[in-house]
Amino acid sequence: MKYLGIFAFIVFFSCSSSRMIETNLYFGQSRPDGSMVTETEWNDFKQGYIDKVFKEGSSVINVRGSWYDSSAHKLITEPSYMVINHHKTSSAISKQIDSLCYWYKKIFIQQSVLRVDKKVKATF
């Protein structure tokens, strides 16, 4: 019985989870002129901006998203990149993420970058 308690203690603390924020960012690839953000341009942006903010890593998933263009009055579907990152709550990181969105919109002439933040428990 003594060993069962020790085993439970080790398992509990080695698998402990921490409270974090999961941030999902959706970067559309279509430009207003009909051209697309190229893979090279995306990789340059990722290395120059995203990797500097998410120094501990992130995941990138190719997705296809839809959004309503209120000026054209129609639903737009486009290829996008979804970036997922888990981080501790911090106003500094939040401002850096806002900056990522700002620069992507400015560089690639985007109306918006969707940002979704949610509280999660993560175990590494």
Model regions and ranges:
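Terminal, regulation- and interaction-focused segments at domain boundaries
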Residues: M20-E39
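Sec-dependent N-terminal signal peptides
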Residues: L4-F12
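Short, intrinsically disordered low-complexity segments
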Residues: V53-M82
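Soluble non-cytosolic domains of exported or imported proteins
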Residues: M36, T40-D44, S91-K95
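Short amphipathic alpha-helical segments
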Residues: E41-K55
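A general secondary-structure signal for short beta-strands and their flanking turns/coil
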Residues: S18-E22, E78-S80
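Helix-rich interaction surfaces within compact, conserved domain-sized segments
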Residues: L75-F124
